[in-house]
Each structure stands twice: as C-alpha cells, then as structure tokens.
Amino acid sequence: MHSDAFDLKALIRPVVDFPKPGVIFRDITPLFQSPRGLRYVADQFIERYVEAEFSHIGAMDARGFLIGSIIAHQLNKPLILFRKQGKLPADVLSEGYQTEYGEAFLEVHADSLCEGDSVLIFDDLIATGGTLLAAANLVRRTGAQVFEAAAIIDLPELDGSRRLQAAGVPTFCLTEFSLSEY
C-alpha cells in the first residue's frame, strides 16, 4: 500500500446494498470528478511503473478502462482491452470465471498479444480476484506473461489478492477497505 497526506478513501463513495443487499459497493466516480484525486491516482501508478519492464497494459471492462488508458498514455504503452463476453468484434479468446455476484466470461482479441509480451493488468478494484485471474489466464494463453495486477482498491477479506499471488500474479493496490468499512 502507498499512502501520504492525500485522503484517497474520501473520494471513494460507499453505496450500501448495491448491487444487492449486504454489499457495500465502492463507487469511484467521485474520484474521477476530482482533478486532484485523479492526478494523485495516476501519479502513484506512473511513479511505480515508469521504469518497469513490461510491454503492454491490459485494462478490465469497464472501470479498469478509465485508469488503464491514462496510465497507458502516460507510459506510452499499447492498451489491450479485456471485455465482457460479446463486446469485441474480431476473433477472441474467452475465459470463464466467478465473480462475487455470479459467473461471467472475459474476452480479449486473439491477436492482441504474443509470446514475449509482458502485461501489466489494471482494474479499479480487487475483490475475489476473478476478473484479474481470468485476464491473467487469457494473457498466458497468448504466450505472453503477466507482469503485475494493479488496482486502486483492494478488499482483502475477499481473498482476491491472495488468490492472484497464489496463481503467480503479483498485486499492487493504492488503498484497501474492510467489508464493513464506510
């Protein structure tokens, strides 16, 4: 975790009982409405990765696109989009996974990566790790390697970061929340 005097958590809105009862959803839209907050998040990731040895950035549909595209632009790296099933127009690789809400499928264009590529994968949040594990599996199926999985938020009680690390995927998050934290 990285921290300084900036209160990142204050820009992440808790939404109780969304999308279902008992869940506290972590809404990052206030972060994107704050130029200072967005700059802070981008700067933290850029500082971490500016000299890192990877070739591509992979961003998860949909909120991962927001920060992933900024970092790809700032680091001058190609951006690979990992989309929900049925959203990509060309030949795809598909990977099923479990989320905290049920089963889903993640897809990537089959020709977007190749052997020797190294991919930093981004999402807004790590909960169960299902989305990023599916992305890591897709990356590996292309012959590429996963450099690291990065997110703004970690929910460590849901074990996603632990699951990613157990699968050989290092993780980095800017902040974390307990499941009951408001």
UniProtKB/Swiss-Prot annotation:
Listed name of the protein: Adenine phosphoribosyltransferase
Keyword terms of this UniProt record: Cytoplasm, Glycosyltransferase, Purine salvage, Transferase
Gene: apt
Pathway it works in: Purine metabolism; AMP biosynthesis via salvage pathway; AMP from adenine: step 1/1
Sequence similarity: Belongs to the purine/pyrimidine phosphoribosyltransferase family.
Main location class: cytoplasm
EC number assigned by the record: 2.4.2.7
NCBIfam families attached to this UniProt entry: apt, PRK02304.1-3, PRK02304.1-5
Reactions mediated catalytically: AMP + diphosphate = 5-phospho-alpha-D-ribose 1-diphosphate + adenine
Description of how the protein assembles with itself and partners: Homodimer.
